[in-house]
């Protein structure tokens, strides 16, 4: 369910705005999206896992907040990010 260190490093490299960037909204949203996708796959087999479902809702809420922040600060970066991640909004 969790994101491996190798996959996380790959995501950071792909979405970083500068060398060593791990905290930009783009990187955070990309990592959250990976975690959300992993949990969504988990729920296909474990439909009654309500404890993890609550965690999924928290992740979605965090991602939504970061996306709202990014849209408010720089709409071009926001549009590029949701296009790259395939998030509908």
Curated annotation (Swiss-Prot):
Molecular function GO terms recorded: rRNA binding; structural constituent of ribosome
Signal peptide: none
Keyword Ribonucleoprotein listed: yes
Tree of life domain: Bacteria
GO biological process: translation
SMART domains: Ribosomal_S15 (SM01387)
Family annotation (CDD domains): Ribosomal_S15p_S13e (cd00353)
Keyword annotations: Ribonucleoprotein, Ribosomal protein, RNA-binding, rRNA-binding
Gene Ontology CC: one annotated term: cytosolic small ribosomal subunit
Oligomeric form and interacting partners: Part of the 30S ribosomal subunit. Forms a bridge to the 50S subunit in the 70S ribosome, contacting the 23S rRNA.
NCBIfam families, A to Z: S15_bact
PANTHER family in the record: RIBOSOMAL PROTEIN S15, BACTERIAL AND ORGANELLAR, SMALL RIBOSOMAL SUBUNIT PROTEIN US15M
Role summary: One of the primary rRNA binding proteins, it binds directly to 16S rRNA where it helps nucleate assembly of the platform of the 30S subunit by binding and bridging several RNA helices of the 16S rRNA.
Family matches, as HAMAP family: Ribosomal_uS15_B
Family: Belongs to the universal ribosomal protein uS15 family.
Name of the molecule in the record: Small ribosomal subunit protein uS15
Organism of provenance: Sinorhizobium medicae (strain WSM419) (Ensifer medicae)
């Amino acid at each position: 369910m969790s994101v491996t260190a190798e996959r996380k490093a790959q995501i950071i490299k792909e979405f970083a705005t500068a060398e060593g960037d791990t905290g930009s909204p783009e990187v955070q949203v990309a990592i959250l999206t990976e975690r959300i996708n992993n949990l969504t796959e988990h729920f296909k087999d474990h439909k009654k896992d309500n404890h993890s479902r609550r965690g999924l809702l928290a992740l979605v809420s965090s991602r939504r907040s970061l996306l709202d922040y990014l849209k408010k600060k720089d709409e071009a970066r926001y549009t590029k990010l949701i296009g790259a991640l395939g998030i509908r909004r």
